[in-house]
A protein has these predicted regions:
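Structural beta-alpha unit
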Residues: 1-22, 34, 48, 98-132, ...
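Small/aliphatic-rich secondary-structure junction motif
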Residues: 2-3, 17-76, 184
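Short, well-ordered secondary-structure micro-motifs
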Residues: 38-39, 65-68, 121-122, 144-145, ...
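General small-molecule cofactor/ligand-binding pocket signal
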Residues: 54-56, 108-112, 166-168
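A short acidic, glycine-rich active-site loop
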Residues: 74-91, 142
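Glycine-rich, Arg-bearing micro-motifs that act as flexible, cationic patches
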Residues: 131-159, 175-178
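Short, acidic/small-residue loops that bind anionic groups at enzyme active sites
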Residues: 155-169
Length: 184
């Protein structure tokens, strides 16, 4: 299914019929230019479970300011340039359309904001998700430093919620003599 969210934040509940979060879904956290393998593995598990798939992108350039009692989430940008998050979501949608076109699974996209682990956790609670799928981080010194300061999304999800998590390797396994900090 093509994007039923029309760019709307899946956390918002302003219009419960058009923005309802699919129940018992498989959730996959996706970033732009991520290998297609993460999406195809998530689709495979959604098909096995007979569950819908939510392709979630977290805009880390925005943060949650507050949530209305009705569930509508208000956000504010960290940077005044909003176009970065919108462009990333468009790239995620294009990748999802290409990867999931013939997958035989109902899917939708969700734009989340803030900390990736907390945003995915919140969405998983709303959907009563069966599984959360994420990819490993990219190799390279820059990604190692980023992970040192922000932590692994997969590890943080494993410690902060109780749903099963599938971590999909992005690259071929490293050999024993490979440099883990080398850019790929």
């Amino acid at each position: 299914m093509a994007d039923a969210q029309s760019g709307a934040d899946a956390q918002s509940g302003a219009d419960s019929e058009s923005r309802a979060v699919p129940h018992r879904a498989v959730i996959v956290g996706v970033i732009p230019d991520q290998p297609q393998r993460v999406l195809t593995e998530a689709a495979r598990y959604a098909r096995l479970f007979g569950a819908p798939l939510i392709v979630a992108h977290v805009d880390v350039t925005r943060f949650v300011t507050y949530e209305d009692p009705g569930g509508y989430v208000h956000t504010a940008p960290i940077d005044l340039d909003n176009s970065a998050g919108e462009a990333q979501l468009a790239r995620v949608r294009e990748a999802a359309t290409a990867a999931l076109g013939g997958a035989g699974v109902e899917w939708t996209t969700a734009q989340l904001v803030g900390d990736p682990a907390l945003a995915l956790k919140h969405l998983a609670e709303q959907a009563d998700a069966r599984l959360i799928v994420v990819g490993t981080r990219r190799r390279g010194f820059g990604e190692t430093v980023r992970e040192f300061f922000t932590g692994s999304v997969a590890a943080r999800l494993a410690h902060r919620q109780s749903r099963p998590i599938l971590v999909v390797p992005l690259d071929d396994p490293m050999q024993g003599n490979d440099d883990p900090w080398a850019e790929t």
